[in-house]
Amino acid sequence: MGTNLTNMDGKSKFQDMSIAPQHTAEHLLNATMVKMFGCPRSRNAHVEKKKSKCDYLLDAEPTAEQVAEIEAKINEVIGQNLDVTIEFMSREEAGRIVDLSKLPEDASETLRIVRIGDYDACACIGAHVGNTSEIGTFKVISHSYENGVWRLRWKVVL
């Protein structure tokens, strides 16, 4: 039995504008993790208004200094007031720009690519803010490391 990703009106949870700031922040977190640690984007994410979490495959637990750097870098990028834009392109063209390894096999031949300035680009069906200035402040709540998986719990303070 699969996960139900729709709400009562049949819309995807990812298209819920009330979590757009958090969803865009998740993209910034993923891009920051890839840049800092060379790891893949989160293997598992749960994005909500009050708090969110993402899991990353890492060889070692990030230090307290690295965790502080992650938070600072994301807030620095938020403060750059970057435009968040959406483009539609062929799967072949998108494959030259973004990692499509997590894309379902039955995904459309035309993909929706979300760009956050020149900081991140990702295939995504979800709702996003129009500019990083709409996100608020990214705050790390807690983190844990077990069996090569680092879980980061975080929130956005509007």
Predicted region positions:
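Active-/binding-site microenvironments in catalytic and ligand-binding cores
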Residues: 1-158
